Amino acid sequence: MWRLKVADGGNDPYIYSMNNFIGRQIWEFDPNAGTPEERAEIERLRHHFTKNRHKGFPSADLLWRVQLLREKNFKQSIPAVKVGDGEEISYEMALDAMRRGAHFLAAIQASDGHWPSETSGPLFYVCPLLICMYIMGFMDKVFSPEHKKEMMRYIYNHQNEDGGWGLHVGGHSNMFCTTFNYISLRLLGEEPDVEAVCKARNWIHDHDGVTSILSWGKTWLSILNVFDWSASNPMPPEYWMLPTWVPIHPSNMMCYTRITYMPMSYLYGKRFQAPLTPLVLQLRDELHTQPYDQINWRKVRHMCATEDLYFPHPFVQDLLWDTLYLLSEPLMTRWPFNKLIRQKALNETMRHIHYEDENSRYITIGCVEKPLCMLACWVEDPNSEYVKKHLARIPDYLWMAEDGMKMQSFGSQSWDAALAMQALLSCNITREIGSVLNSGHDFIKNSQVRNNPPGDYKSMFRYMSKGSWTFSDCDHGWQVSDCTAENLKCCLLLSLLPPDIVGEKMEPERFYDAVNVILNMQSKNGGLPAWEPASSYYWMEWLNPVEFLEDLIIEHQHVECTSSALQAILLFRKQYPGHRRKEINNFINKAVQFLQDIQLPDGSWYGNWGICYTYGTWFALKALSMAGKTYENCEAVRKGANFLRKIQNPEGGFGESYLSCPYKRYIPLDGKRSNLVQTAWGMMGLICAGQADVDPTPIHRAAKLLINSQTEDGDFPQEEITGEFFKNCTLHFAAFREVFPVMALGEYCNKVPLPSKKK
C-alpha cells in the first residue's frame, strides 16, 4: 500500500535541505501497510476512477486524503446543510456550511503544517524521465514493479477513446503526447501487441507517423535515437557565450525557457544519442511509417502535426533556424571550431547547469527541466556526485492518486498553504482551529527563502530571492512574486491575532525582505511578472520555438501577480506605515493603474494561471477593492461586476471552459455546466465588487450552489481542471476544490448581510 511521507529526507547521503525538509512530500510503497478494509477501499476508489475516466476529470487526490483522515480519525460533527427551492439562506445555514468546510480543510493538513496536494494535468511530463532512466541504466533501480504498475495505470486511465493522448487531461489527442505515452508504456515493459498499445500506434500511423511531432518531441526522440538530430532546429550552446546586451542572450529569456534550453543545447551540442538497443530499434519500426534509413530528416525539421500546432513559427523564426542550420552548425561541428568554440560553449553551458542544480538542491526549476539537467550531468560524467544528487530528488516529483502515479509539475506546497490559510482566516473561527493556524503559520515562516542565490548570482542571470517564497518548498529556491505576496499576506494577517493561539509573528526584517522582493519586481507599466523582473523586448516572442505554448520566451506582467502583490503591499503599509513610504505609495498607484489599464472591453481580465476570465476578474476586483475602488466610485469595478453577472449560470454557478485560454474569448463549459471552484471565484469577485450593496441576489444564488454541493464530510466534489499556463495547457490543483469554496463561504458569512433564524 502506498503511503505519503512528509518532511522526511530519508537516509540518502546525497540529499540535503535548507530547512530540514519541511514541506517535502514523497510516496513510498509498503507491502505490509493497511488493513484489508483499507486496501479494499483504495481498490474501490481506483475502480471508480477507471470506470468514469472518459468524463475527462482529473483525480480527486483521494489516496492522500484517505490516509490522513484515517490517521486523524476525522469525523464530521456538524450536520449537513441543504437549501430548499425558494428557501432563503440564513446566517446559521451559511455558518454551518462554512464551518463544515473549514473543519474538513483543517483535517487534511499535514504534520509539518502544509497541505499536500497533487499538481499535475499535462500528459507529457513522465516520458522524458523514463527515457532518462532508461538511457542511464537506472530504470529498475529507481522504479520498483509497483512504481511501474501505477505509472501504467495513470497512462491508461488518461488514454482517449480514439487511442491517443491529449496535451493534458481531458484534451484532444495529439501526436506529441500520444507518442510520448506510447514510448512510456514500452519503456515500462508493455508489449507492442497489447490492445491499447496497438490502438495508440494506429492513431500515430493514421496521422502520418511520428515525423510530424513538435520540436520538443523531436529533441527527446533524437536523444533516444529514434530520430536523427538533423531533424531538429539548431539549439547552439554558443548562445551562452554571447554578450548579455544581445537581445537573444538566454539571460533575457523567461527563466523556465532559459533553463529548459540550457541542457537541451548541451545535449544538442554534443549530439548525444542513446545506444542502439533492441527496444530502440523496435520503437523505430513501430513509430515510423517508412524505413528509418529512408527518412529525409532535413525535410521533417519544420513539420508539426495539425493536432500539435498552437503557435506557428513566424517566417523570421524559420529564417533564423535555417541560417544556423545551413551555415553555423556545419562549422561548429568541424575542426577547428568544434575545439575552439563549441567545446568552450559546452563547458560554459555545463557551468550554468551545475549552478542551477545546486541552487535548487537538485530539484531543479521544474519537471521539464529535471530530466534534461540530470541527463546532461550523466553525459558529462556518469559516475559524478551530480548524478547521485539528481537521483535522490526524483521522488519529489512523483505523486500517487486513485488514477495512478504521475510526475508532477513540481510541488505547490507554499502556494496551497497560503491559500488554505487565507481560506481558514476568512472564516473568522480562530479559536476553533487555532492549532491548525499555528502549524500553518510555522510552515509558512519556515518556508521563506532566507538568502539570495550563492556567489555572484547576477552573473549567473539570477534575481534576488532573499525574503521570497517559492511555489513549492524552501529547497526549490525559486522566488515567485504572487507566492511571495500571498504568504506575506498570511503572515501579516496572522500577526494581528493572539500569538498564544497562532504563534509568534514573523520578525519585521523578514517582512521588509519580502516587501523588497515585491517592490523590485514591478515593471514600468505597474504590473508584476511571476519570477523575475520583465525587461526584454516583446518582439522576442516571435522567436518562440515551442509550437504548443505561447508567451514563454520573456517575462510578462500578469493580473494575478499584480493583484496579489498589491494586496500584500496594502496590508503591509497599514501595519508598517513608515517603511519606504514614498516607494510603496508609488508602487500602489502604478499597480492600481495597471489593473485598470488591462481590463478588457467586456469588463473582464484574462487570467494566466487559472481558467481564465473568471479567475482573472476575481483577482483584479479583489485588489481594486482593497485599494478603495468601489462599485460607486470606479467604472472598472462596475464593468467587472457586470461581466460576472452576465456569465453567471441560471442556477447561480459559474463554469468556464479551458478553451477560453487558447481562443482568448470567454467560452462556457458544455451545457453551461457550473464548476464549484469557478463558482467560488465568481462569487468572491461579486462580493469584492460590492454587489451585495446593489443587489445581493447573484451572490446568494452562487452561495446556494456551493452549500448544496457540499459532501457529507464537508468536502466538495472534484470537477474539471481549473488551472492553466502559457495559454494552451491546463494544470490540476487538487487543493482548489476545498480551498476556494471554503474561502468564498467565509467571505459570504462575514461580508454579506444574512437574516438570522435566532429570535
Curated annotation (Swiss-Prot):
Highest taxon of source: Eukaryota
Entry annotation: catalytic residues: D482 (proton donor)
UniProt enzyme class: isomerase
Keywords: Isomerase, Repeat
Stretches forming PFTB repeats: 148-189, 588-628, 637-678, 699-743
NCBIfam families: squalene_cyclas
Protein name (database record): Isomultiflorenol synthase
Organism from which the protein derives: Luffa aegyptiaca (Sponge gourd)
